[in-house]
C-alpha cells in the first residue's frame, strides 16, 4: 500500500469515527449505529464525499442531519471540502432499523409498563376543564427537558387536544413500517391525535376507540429511553383515565386545580381515582393563584386555598402525604406564550410564573423511579 493510500485509509477511519458521534435528531442514536452511513469516499487533497441514508424521502430533519454530518467531518484534521449526498433507505433497510430499535416482537409492548422501566410517568389530571392543565404540562415538560433529561409528552386528551399548538409544532410524525417517530419540539418528543387530523376537524370517538388510540401511542410510538413521560389527560375520571391506569399502572398522578374552592372539590375527585386504581399521587399544582400587582401584592381573582385543600384532603384519603408542589400566579403572558407556541419557561424564565414553574419542574425531575422490582443484574453467587 502506497503512502497516499495509507493516508486516505487513515483519514477514512478518522471520518468514520467522527460520524459515530453524529446523533440522529429524531431517533437520538448515532447514525453509524442506525445504518445511515451509505459510503465514505476520500479524494485527493482530503476532499470527502459521504452518502447518508434517510428513513424516508420527506424526512423533516434532513437539513439538520446534513449540517451535523458536514460539521463532524470538517472538524477532522486533514479534511478539505465536504460533500454530503442523501439517499433513502430501502424497505429491507427500514425493517432492519425497526428491529434494531424495537426488537423482533410481533406485538409491540408498552415499554413504560415493564418492570425494568426507569421512566417516570406523570399523568396530569384535573377535575374540570379550563384550569390550565395543558399549560402546566407543556411548561413542566419543557423545563425538565431544559435540565438535560429526555422527556416525552403524550396528548391523551383526544377530544380536546391542544398540545401541538401550545408547543408551536405542526410537524407530523414519521411512519417507519409499524413504528411511529414523534416530532421533537423544544427538545421534547410530542405525540397527539392532532398531528393526524386535518385542520380543526373534531375527533368523534367513543371509549373503545379512545383506549386503542392511547394504546397505540404508548406502544407503536418510538419514544426511546425517556427519563420522564408526561400524559396530558382529559378532565375528569372517564375512559382515558381508566385506560391509563390499566396500561401504565405505575404512572403517578399530578393534580392541577385553581384556588377556587368549587373547582378544588372537582379536582379532589380526579385525584381520588388513585384509591380505585392504586396509583400514587405525586402532588397538587395550583394554577391561576392570584394576579401579581405592580406594588408586589397579589389579587386573589379566583379566591384562595383551593390547592392546599385538595392536597390535605387527598392526603387523608390515600393515607400518605400529598404535597402542594407549587402555586402558579395568574399572568396574561402565560396565555400569550401558549398561543405563540413558546412555553413561558423558555422566553420568560425570570418572571414570577416562570420561576414557579421551574421550581416545580426541578422537584419532579430530581425524583428517581423506585427500584422495587427492577433487576440490577447482580448475581450473589458470583464473587
From Swiss-Prot:
Q: Which CDD domains match?
A: Mrp_NBP35
Set out the biological process GO terms recorded for this chain's protein: iron-sulfur cluster assembly
Q: Which domain of life is it from?
A: Bacteria
UniProt-annotated binding residues for ATP: 127-134
One Pfam entry name: FeS_assembly_P
Keywords assigned: ATP-binding, Hydrolase, Iron, Iron-sulfur, Metal-binding, Nucleotide-binding
A Gene Ontology molecular function term for this protein is: ATP-dependent FeS chaperone activity
Carries keyword Iron-sulfur?
yes
Q: What does this protein do?
A: Binds and transfers iron-sulfur (Fe-S) clusters to target apoproteins. Can hydrolyze ATP.
Subunit info?
Homodimer.
Family, per entry: In the N-terminal section; belongs to the MIP18 family. In the C-terminal section; belongs to the Mrp/NBP35 ATP-binding proteins family.
Q: What name does the UniProt record give this protein?
A: Iron-sulfur cluster carrier protein
Organism of origin is Mycobacterium leprae (strain TN)
Amino acid at each position: 500500500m502506497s503512502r497516499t493510500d495509507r493516508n486516505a485509509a487513515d483519514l477514512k477511519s478518522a471520518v468514520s469515527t467522527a460520524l459515530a458521534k453524529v446523533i440522529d435528531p429524531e431517533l437520538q442514536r448515532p447514525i453509524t449505529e442506525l445504518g445511515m452511513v451509505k459510503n465514505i469516499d476520500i479524494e485527493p487533497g482530503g476532499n470527502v464525499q459521504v452518502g447518508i441514508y434517510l428513513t424516508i424521502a420527506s424526512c423533516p430533519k434532513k437539513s439538520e442531519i446534513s449540517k451535523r454530518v458536514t460539521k463532524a467531518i470538517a472538524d477532522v484534521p486533514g479534511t478539505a471540502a465536504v460533500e454530503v449526498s442523501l439517499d433513502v433507505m430501502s424497505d429491507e433497510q427500514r425493517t432492519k432499523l425497526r428491529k434494531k430499535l424495537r426488537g423482533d416482537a410481533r406485538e409491540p409492548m408498552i415499554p413504560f409498563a415493564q418492570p425494568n422501566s426507569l421512566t417516570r410517568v406523570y399523568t396530569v389530571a384535573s377535575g374540570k376543564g379550563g384550569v390550565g392543565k395543558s399549560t402546566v404540562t407543556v411548561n413542566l415538560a419543557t423545563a425538565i427537558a431544559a435540565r438535560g433529561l429526555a422527556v416525552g409528552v403524550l396528548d391523551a386528551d383526544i377530544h380536546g387536544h391542544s398540545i401541538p399548538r401550545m408547543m408551536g409544532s405542526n410537524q407530523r410524525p414519521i411512519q417507519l413500517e409499524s413504528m411511529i417517530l414523534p416530532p421533537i419540539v423544544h427538545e421534547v418528543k410530542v405525540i397527539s391525535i392532532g398531528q393526524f387530523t386535518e385542520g380543526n376537524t373534531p375527533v368523534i370517538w367513543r371509549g373503545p376507540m379512545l383506549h386503542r388510540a392511547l394504546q397505540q401511542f404508548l406502544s407503536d410510538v418510538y419514544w426511546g429511553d425517556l427519563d420522564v413521560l408526561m400524559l396530558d389527560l382529559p378532565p375528569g375520571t372517564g375512559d382515558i383515565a381508566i385506560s391509563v391506569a390499566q396500561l401504565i399502572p405505575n404512572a403517578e398522578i399530578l393534580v392541577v386545580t385553581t384556588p377556587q374552592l368549587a373547582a378544588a372539590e372537582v379536582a379532589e375527585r380526579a385525584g381520588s381515582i388513585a384509591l380505585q386504581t392504586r396509583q400514587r399521587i405525586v402532588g397538587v399544582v395550583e394554577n391561576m393563584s392570584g394576579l401579581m400587582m405592580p406594588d408586589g401584592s397579589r389579587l386573589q381573582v379566583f379566591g384562595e386555598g383551593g390547592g392546599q385543600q385538595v392536597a390535605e384532603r387527598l392526603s387523608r384519603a390515600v393515607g400518605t402525604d400529598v404535597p402542594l408542589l407549587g402555586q402558579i400566579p395568574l399572568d396574561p403572558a402565560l396565555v400569550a406564550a401558549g398561543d405563540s407556541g413558546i412555553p413561558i419557561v423558555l422566553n420568560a424564565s425570570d418572571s414570577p410564573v416562570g420561576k414557579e414553574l421551574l421550581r416545580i419542574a426541578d422537584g419532579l425531575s430530581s425524583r428517581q423511579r423506585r427500584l422495587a422490582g427492577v433487576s440490577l443484574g447482580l448475581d450473589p453467587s458470583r464473587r
